[in-house]
Amino acid sequence: MYGRSGLDRFKKSQTSEPFSVSANPPPVVQQHLSPEALSGQKTQIGAGQSNWHPPDWAIEPRAGVYSLEVVKDGQILDRIHLDRRRHIFGRQHQTCDFVLDHQSVSRQHAAVVPHKNGSIFVIDLGSAHGTFVANERLTKDTPVELEVGQSLRFAASTRIYLLRKNSEALFSRPPPPAEIKLPPPPDASDEEAVVAYNTLLNRYGLSNGESGGMLGKRKEKTGSEAGVAKRMKKVRVSFRDQLGGELAEIVGMSDGADVETEPGPINVKEGSLVGKYESLVRVTLIPKGKVKEEKAFTGGTRGGVTDRLQEAMNMLKRGPKTGIYDDLYGGDSLAKAVGTSWASVSQPAAETECGGVGEEDDNDDLFGD
């Protein structure tokens, strides 16, 4: 029925225990990839001839600070250093900077761009299967910050890119050259040369003792001069007279000395600088205390006096009025309009014996004393 070969397989299946679990299972063997296998799984470098331009805020960062750690199945495969102004990831070798060999990755998939504020941003370039930052899919042409330690994935690729930052590279000093050619020590009297020489030593991280025996001998001879130069270096503000010069004379107030009060430079002919410094000079008079007003006002208009008040003051200065109601009806204007008026004062026709008394009555006030 089974045949010879089929019977042998049937007997073997009865004797074997394919689903049995032993008490001591064999240890799991971890596979370690050889360097040759790892080199085959490293990210390929493309030609980088894409026409895509990064935003204006993109900069070229300092080398060695940021990098992408390529991880697959818990094993680090590669490390991509982010030291360019743009890093385009995709499947096309000619246009991309880093080539991803996966069928779900677009030709120009995404770009990693350093920001001028020191952070890293990821921009999706319209990929078909998406770009993911911390398992969140990005919107097309929308920059999203990739923080340190977050994951970056492209489409259905199983590779995970983790952002790493090397803070020591930000403040690391460049290694000093193997041989340093220093000029001979300058003369101590030349202060500018001494400062330039000390600046050169500080640039290479050297002290005066390490720069050579000749400099050490010079330091022993001119120890006091070096102390003076050090104190002068600490002074932030220096005046011309401290360096052997002369200060320019400034016209102004002095302690009882007679000085000129006219503004302007010294030893310059009057009128030669007209129009150059005229706008810089302004004279303001500030009176001390209250100034008594003049009792007599002669001509002109005082400040704060209206035209109507000025007209009333001018009418008072014309002398005595011809009528007792001239102030109310405009004085002469009413008399010219109606001729002789009852408001005008008529002269007496003839003098009587009581003429003296009449003159006194006319001179008296209307309402009496």
From Swiss-Prot:
Q: Which domain of life is it from?
A: Eukaryota
Compositionally biased spans, kind Basic and acidic residues: 1-11
Give the protein name, as stated in the record: Protein phosphatase 1 regulatory inhibitor subunit PPP1R8 homolog
What is the organism field in this record?
Answer: Arabidopsis thaliana
Q: How does it assemble?
A: Interacts with human protein phosphatase PPP1C.
What is known about what this protein does?
Inhibitor of protein-phosphatase 1 (PP1). Binds to and inhibits PP1 activity.
- The answer to whether UniProt assigns keyword Plastid to this entry is no
Asked whether the UniProt record includes Protease among its keywords, one would answer: no
Which InterPro entries is this protein grouped with? Answer: Cell_Proc_Reg/RNA_Proc (IPR050923), FHA_dom (IPR000253), SMAD_FHA_dom_sf (IPR008984)
Q: What spans are recorded as compositionally biased (Polar residues)?
A: 13-23
In Gene Ontology terms, what is one molecular function of this protein? protein phosphatase inhibitor activity
Q: Which residues form the FHA domain?
A: 87-138
Q: Where is the composition biased (Acidic residues)?
A: 358-369
Record SUPFAM superfamilies: SMAD/FHA domain
Q: Where is this region: Disordered?
A: 1-26, 345-369
Please provide the record's keywords in A-Z order.
Answer: Protein phosphatase inhibitor
